[in-house]
Regions:
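Residue-level signature of mid-helix packing/kink "hotspots" within the transmembrane helices
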Residues: 46, 74-82, 172, 302-306, ...
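C-terminal transmembrane helical hairpin of 12-TM major facilitator-type secondary transporters
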Residues: 322-371
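C-terminal ends and interior cores of transmembrane alpha-helices
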Residues: 102-119, 332-345
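Helix-loop-helix hairpin linking two adjacent transmembrane segments in secondary transporters
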Residues: 163, 167-216
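Hydrophobic core of transmembrane alpha-helices in multi-pass small-molecule transporters
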Residues: 107, 121-138, 349-363, 367
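Cytoplasmic helix-loop-helix junction between adjacent transmembrane helices
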Residues: 128-166
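Cytoplasmic membrane-interface "Motif A"-like loop-to-helix N-cap segments
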Residues: 90-101, 317-331
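Extracytoplasmic gate region of multi-pass secondary transporters
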Residues: 48-52, 254-309, 396-404
Length: 459
């Protein structure tokens, strides 16, 4: 049998009451595999953001060149989310992402050696960071698939929210871990910010490869809905016996909710990545903060995001799955926090702003993914989540990295959009406001579809 297949075995006839007692222990094995793997992926993703000021100073890269390297990741990551998501649906997604983490770690390790021996070889740096994007692309969709196979619908928001803290934790400590490793083992050289975290990720990938099951039916149990006596979604019933391509055409390509969520995610990511990616550079160039304070901006943003992951999924569960309404509330509050951020001048004000922004923007970032699990069958969750991610990274993330870089870069003349030239950090924040407004409108449509779905299932 294929190493990456789900190996379901005949039902053992274990009473449902016994399965429920054993469920948490077995679920936690699978859960913590995807949790730690995804956390490790952020150690070898956010290290690049933390290294940006050092890459400019030590290697001589420009702001725009850093943007192009980031764009390579965005494009491959975005395309890979859908293409690899289609491939992994119906397979052992838990095992697949452990294997992909190993490949990702090896790639970043090579990137560190390239920086050490060759310096700023732009072509090679773009290829390697783009390859890292391919290997990491399906981490989120695969994790959603594994957790959705185990978690009951009425508790899915909180478990996916708790899982979402994995990249908040990984993202929060990535800069500190990378900088500590560089200072301790590489005499402060920026190459250590790539080599050290990649070794940690490699060890985690190897350690998690054989732990846990991807589906209760691999244990000879009933499906999750039967274990918890929940109604089975119409999509999961109707999709039985359909080919993967038929499922993709009907429940992904032909599903208007998925398309609306895809476009909504673009606007969410313009704000999320725009703040997250450029905060260190913004405070160092515009507010003249020290390098240490610049790196710490990532920490405060990610700690705020940690709060969001724990809070908003649980709140949406309490509202019986009304994910879009909660997401709209978060985006509305962000408009006020962005205003505070633009007027912040001290380290404390900036860090408070970033904490609040993280606590709010990761609400819709999480809930868009949770929302789509209610509109597609389980064996299409990876590709559905991947497709929203593809839109987010190909359009939202790339705009945030290259578009906003062109607007903010003081050595350039700004970016011309519809005859209007956007230039400077003030115009960057105007882009955020437009994205928030459009995102709220689209999520309002999704909220309508969610309400119909909830009432049809009589939750």
């Amino acid at each position: 049998m294929n190493f990456f297949d789900i190996h379901k075995i005949p039902n053992k006839g274990i009473p449902l009451s016994v399965q429920r007692k054993l469920w948490l222990r077995n679920f936690m094995q699978a859960f913590f595999v995807v949790f730690f793997v995804y956390m490790a992926m952020y150690l070898i993703r956010n290290n690049f953001k933390a290294a940006q000021p050092f890459l400019k100073e030590e290697i001589g890269l420009s702001t725009l060149e850093l943007g192009y390297i980031g764009l390579a990741f965005s494009i491959t990551y975005g395309l890979g989310k859908t293409l690899l998501g289609y491939f992994v649906d119906g397979r052992n997604t838990k095992r697949i992402i452990s294997f992909l983490l190993i490949l990702s770690a090896i790639t970043v390790l090579i990137m560190g050696f390239v920086l050490s021996y060759f310096g700023s070889v732009m072509g090679l740096l773009i290829v390697l960071w783009g390859l890292n994007g391919v290997f990491q692309s399906v981490g989120g969709p695969a994790s959603y698939s594994t957790i959705s196979r185990w978690a009951p619908r009425t508790k899915r928001g909180r478990y996916l929210g708790f899982w979402n803290t994995s990249h908040n934790i990984g993202g929060a400590i990535a800069g500190g871990v990378a900088l500590w490793g560089a200072n301790v083992f590489f005499h402060g050289n920026v190459i250590g910010m790539f080599i050290f975290p990649s070794v940690i990720a490699l060890l985690i990938g190897i350690a998690t490869l054989f732990i846990g099951k991807d589906d209760p039916e691999e244990l000879g149990w009933n499906r999750t809905e039967e274990i918890w006596e929940e109604p089975v979604d119409k999509e999961n019933i109707d999709s039985q016996g359909m080919t993967k391509w038929e499922i993709f055409k009907k429940y992904i390509l032909g599903n208007p909710v998925i398309w609306i969520l895809c476009v909504s995610n673009v606007f969410v990511y313009i704000v999320r990545i725009g703040i997250d990616n450029w905060a260190p550079l913004y405070v160092s160039e515009h507010l003249h903060f020290s390098k240490g304070d610049a790196v710490n901006t990532i920490f405060y943003f990610e700690i705020g995001a940690l709060v969001a992951s724990l809070l908003w999924g649980y709140v949406s569960d309490l509202l019986k799955g009304r994910r879009a309404i909660v997401a709209i509330g978060c985006m509305f509050m962000i408009t006020f926090v962005v205003l505070f951020y633009t007027n912040a001048t001290s380290v404390m004000m900036v860090n408070i702003s970033l904490f609040a922004l993280g606590a709010l923007i990761f609400g819709p970032q999480l809930l868009i993914g949770v929302s789509l699990t209610g509109f597609v069958p389980k064996n299409a969750i990876s590709v559905a989540n991947g497709m929203t991610g593809s839109f987010a990274y190909l359009f939202g993330d790339s705009m945030a990295k290259v578009g906003l870089a062109a607007i903010a870069d003081p050595t350039r003349n700004g970016l011309n959009i519809f005859g209007y030239t956007l230039s400077g950090w003030t115009d960057v924040f105007i882009v955020f406001y437009v994205a928030l407004f459009l995102g709220m409108i689209l999520l309002g449509i999704v909220a309508f579809y969610e309400e119909k779905k909830i009432r049809s299932l009589k939750i």
